Amino acid sequence: MPYKVPEIYYRFEPQTFYITSPARASNLQLINHNNILVKAGQVTIVSTGIIFPKETSFAFILYGKSAKSIFCHTGLIDPGFQGELKLIVLNKTEDDITLFENDLRVSVTAFVYGVPKLHDYSDLCPPRYSKDAGFDLYLPTDVTVKPRVPNRYSVNICCPAQLKSYKPVLFGRSGLAAKGLTIKVSRWQNQLQIIFYNYTKSQITYTARTRIAQVVFMHKKHLPTTLTRLKPTMHLSENIKYSWARVSFQDIKTFPVQDEKLYSSSKDTSDSQMSRGDAGLGSSGLM
């Protein structure tokens, strides 16, 4: 039988962006049509207008880029998140920056993830909500992050969970990014290495046991190590090439579906875990 491309339905309310990707694309692309002011020393949270009303088996990556001197937090979006996707934008300079029409490009892509069983809870915490993709990573020691420079933190800790064919990848927490602290997307290999960037004007100290990052176990097919000409790719950081899943993003206004197929049943959520719903910014919330 021919492969059936998974369908992912979304709602779109055009406010700041319009969609540039074709119907049924596997990379949902947007570009701004309204000006966006990104103030110096402040965090700007931009609504994309995209909502996934149904839980899926895929996790998502929200990625933004611009030729202007800004940084967009790479967002890990959990399958159970049903709120509006919002992009966290930070200013690299000491002056306000205006993103004019077509200055900010955003993409939403899907990937396959795994949830391994933990045998050691000292560094990782299992997902908090039903259908969460990310594990919370605790800081093993105190760390001080200086403003406006890369801060490298390394500790000789191997990932306490292993899953065949899946690789642990670190993402920054949206809650901390919303306060000005970002983390470079990176692989957790022989040792834990985190590169922080503090976009505030003050030094920040985080104590041991702070939930500092998200770790997601991404299928290795999304992390090609050789040249791939047949699959489109993008860089989540200079050392991480990412190839997204082949899915079909469909606007429910264009491809209407029956309500029972669109909305998740309460039976999908286990008794021991809550459903995320629209809490937070897609993964780690705002706390």
Swiss-Prot record:
Example of a GO MF term: metal ion binding
Catalytic activity line of the entry: dUTP + H2O = dUMP + diphosphate + H(+)
UniProt-annotated binding residues for substrate: R173, S174, G175
Keywords associated with the record: Hydrolase, Magnesium, Metal-binding, Nucleotide metabolism
Single GO biological process annotation from the record: dUTP metabolic process
Gene3D superfamilies per the UniProt record, alphabetical: 2.70.40.10
Region (Disordered), start-end ranges: 264-287
One Pfam family matching this protein: dUTPase
The keyword Hydrolase appears for this protein: yes
Highest taxon listed in the record's lineage: Viruses
Enzyme Commission number(s) of this protein: 3.6.1.23
Low complexity bias: start-end ranges: 264-275
UniProt cofactor(s): Mg(2+)
Function summary: Involved in nucleotide metabolism: produces dUMP, the immediate precursor of thymidine nucleotides and decreases the intracellular concentration of dUTP to avoid uracil incorporation into viral DNA.
Similarity comment: family membership: Belongs to the dUTPase family.
Protein name: Deoxyuridine 5'-triphosphate nucleotidohydrolase
Classification lineage: Viruses, Duplodnaviria, Heunggongvirae, Peploviricota, Herviviricetes
Gene: DUT
